[in-house]
Swiss-Prot record:
Organism, scientific name: Synechococcus sp. (strain JA-2-3B'a(2-13)) (Cyanobacteria bacterium Yellowstone B-Prime)
UniProt-recorded name of the protein: DNA-directed RNA polymerase subunit omega
Domain of life: Bacteria
Pfam families hit by this protein: RNA_pol_Rpb6
Keyword Transferase on entry: yes
Catalytic activity, as annotated: RNA(n) + a ribonucleoside 5'-triphosphate = RNA(n+1) + diphosphate
Keyword list, A-Z: DNA-directed RNA polymerase, Nucleotidyltransferase, Transcription, Transferase
Family of the protein in this entry: Belongs to the RNA polymerase subunit omega family.
Complexes and interactors: In cyanobacteria the RNAP catalytic core is composed of 2 alpha, 1 beta, 1 beta', 1 gamma and 1 omega subunit. When a sigma factor is associated with the core the holoenzyme is formed, which can initiate transcription.
Function per UniProt: Promotes RNA polymerase assembly. Latches the N- and C-terminal regions of the beta' subunit thereby facilitating its interaction with the beta and alpha subunits.
Length: 79
């Protein structure tokens, strides 16, 4: 468990930069917030074992994943 934590853990400053990048890249702040929340919720139900481990909260993981996919416009599109 410790090795996974070290691989994907980011500090709060980096997480906030990623959140700001997501919001700035989106035309609609509310819509991107809902998309991140829905991804976190979906992830929570798809992989309940990760939640029990507690190594990374679903919302943090969703922000990291979506910010990594920022280069794909359909992720944050308004359609």
């Amino acid at each position: 468990m410790a090795s996974r934590k070290n691989q994907l853990a980011i500090d709060n400053d980096e997480l906030m930069r990623r959140v700001e990048a997501l919001i700035n890249a989106s035309k609609n702040r509310y819509r991107i917030t809902v998309q991140v929340a829905n991804r976190a919720k979906r992830r929570r139900y798809e992989d309940p074992d990760d939640i029990e481990d507690g190594w990374m909260k679903p919302i943090r993981r969703a922000v990291i994943e979506m910010s990594d996919e920022l280069t794909e416009p359909e992720i944050i599109g308004d359609e």
